[in-house]
Each structure stands twice: as structure tokens, then as C-alpha cells.
């Protein structure tokens, strides 16, 4: 393990709860499909979650140039990325490199965060992984644990729309990368503070 990896591992032991983090970065990516073997990234978005706010003014947002994979025409209705947008996007490796530089040492938050990180590492073509080996938290698990604390017999849904509805979080641009990243950030704040959330412009 590299020295950098060792430092990240040590910090992960020191802070095992997302509620202890002074700042998280809520990440979401849009892809050509959900098949990890063939999918390609179309867009990357991330927003800082700091204090009681999702800080949209400091967001990271990039459109990525897809390669050979075809974009599902039906999916365009949701992620709203036209072929012309994707054609003029950044090369995947450049987009991911810029994201990693922007992210720094901050821990990640997301929905199915493991899939997103795997896709980013593959797009960067960095053998052996480790590109995003810092702390990461999945809103599904955070939500599940909180619901089971309230009712051990509960069987909380793991569907994002259900989580948002249960937490009274309005869907903001669902199925766009920045919209979903924002929604997950607001869901986390709802779980942490159990009071109204707001987006900082």
C-alpha cells in the first residue's frame, strides 16, 4: 500500500460515520446503460455538502465524450444529454482527472456509489484501481441504518425515489447528474438534522 493509501485507510478508521465528516461530496454520474461491462460515462457531477447546505455554487460538472457505446434514445428523455452535447464533451480520462483534482481528500457520498467509482476508475484507465480509494458512503446504507434504528422490524426501500419521498426531499432534476447529486446531498442532510434542508446558490 502506498503512503497516500495508508493515510486514507487510517483516516477511514478514525471516521467511520458520515455524520462525523465536516464535509462530504455528493457524486453522481450518468452512463449509457447500467451494465458495468459495456456502459460509458456521459456526465459527472458533484456538489459539496457542508454544514446544513448543499453548496451548488461550488459544484463540479462535466459532460464526457462517449466512445463506441450507443446512447439509448429513451434515456435522453431523462438525462437530457443530446448526441451533440456528448460529441463535444471531454475525453473520459481528462474529465476524471479533473474531478479527482477537484475532489481532493474529501469523502464521497452517493447512491450506488460503488458503481460510480468503478466507472470513473475504468474511464481513467488507471490499472489496479486506487484512484478513488478514500472514504465513501452510500445513501442507501445510511438511510437503512437510520430507519432500522427507529424501527428494527422495518424493511426500508432502497429505491432512490422512495428514499426521497420518505425524507420529504423534492426531486430536483432527477436523472441528471447534478440533480441526483443534489437530491442525495439533501437526503443526507434530512437524515442528519431531521429538519428542513436548503440549497445554497
Placement of each model-derived feature along the sequence:
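Short, glycine/acidic-enriched loop or turn micro-motifs at the edges of active sites
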Residues: 29-33, 141, 183
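Short alpha-helix plus adjacent loop in nuclease-associated cores
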Residues: 137-154
Amino acid at each position: 500500500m502506498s503512503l497516500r493509501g495508508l493515510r486514507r485507510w487510517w483516516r477511514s478508521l478514525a471516521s467511520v460515520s458520515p455524520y462525523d465528516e465536516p464535509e462530504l461530496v455528493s457524486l453522481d454520474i450518468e452512463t449509457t446503460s447500467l451494465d458495468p461491462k459495456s456502459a460509458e460515462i456521459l456526465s459527472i457531477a458533484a456538489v459539496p455538502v457542508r454544514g446544513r447546505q448543499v453548496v451548488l455554487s461550488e459544484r463540479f460538472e462535466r459532460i464526457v465524450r462517449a466512445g463506441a457505446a450507443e446512447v439509448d434514445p429513451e434515456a435522453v428523455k431523462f438525462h437530457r444529454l443530446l448526441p451533440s452535447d456528448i460529441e463535444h464533451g471531454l475525453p473520459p480520462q481528462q474529465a476524471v482527472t479533473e474531478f479527482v483534482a477537484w475532489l481532493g481528500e474529501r469523502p464521497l457520498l452517493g447512491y450506488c456509489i460503488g458503481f460510480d467509482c468503478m466507472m470513473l476508475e475504468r474511464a481513467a484507465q488507471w490499472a489496479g484501481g486506487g484512484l478513488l480509494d478514500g472514504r465513501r458512503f452510500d445513501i442507501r446504507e445510511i438511510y437503512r441504518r437510520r430507519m432500522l434504528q427507529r424501527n428494527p422490524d422495518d424493511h426500508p426501500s432502497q429505491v432512490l425515489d422512495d428514499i426521497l419521498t420518505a425524507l420529504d426531499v423534492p426531486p430536483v432534476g432527477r436523472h441528471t447528474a447534478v440533480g441526483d447529486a443534489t437530491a442525495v446531498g439533501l437526503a443526507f442532510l434530512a437524515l442528519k438534522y431531521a429538519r428542513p434542508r436548503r440549497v445554497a446558490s
